[in-house]
């Protein structure tokens, strides 16, 4: 039975979206490609940035078979592997309601 998780990607600094350098911008492009591929497979149901006035961060809702799978997905994200200072928070969603 699939399990759903909410994941929050916290950037290394509140101003990251406004002042990322070329290397960070390149890695964010790889990050987007990575999650888009997972969306096309039906694993990432939705993902994207949240425009919080205190600092932009990313969210994702995933559908996986087991909790270990979400850990693997987040640790293999290019921005996490690169060690840029991002942190990840992942929480199970035990009961969801899906629309069409």
Task: Label every PLM stretch briefly.
Residues 1-100:
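Conserved, structured core segments of small domains
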């Amino acid at each position: 039975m699939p399990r759903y998780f909410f994941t929050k990607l916290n950037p290394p600094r509140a101003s990251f979206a406004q002042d990322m350098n070329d290397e960070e911008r390149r890695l964010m492009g790889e990050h987007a490609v990575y999650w888009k591929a997972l969306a096309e497979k039906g694993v990432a149901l939705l993902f994207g940035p949240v425009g919080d006035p205190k600092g932009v961060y990313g969210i994702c809702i995933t559908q996986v078979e087991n909790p270990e799978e979400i850990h693997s997905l987040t640790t293999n994200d290019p921005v996490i592997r690169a060690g840029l200072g991002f942190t990840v928070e992942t929480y199970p969603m035990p009961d969801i309601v899906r629309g069409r």
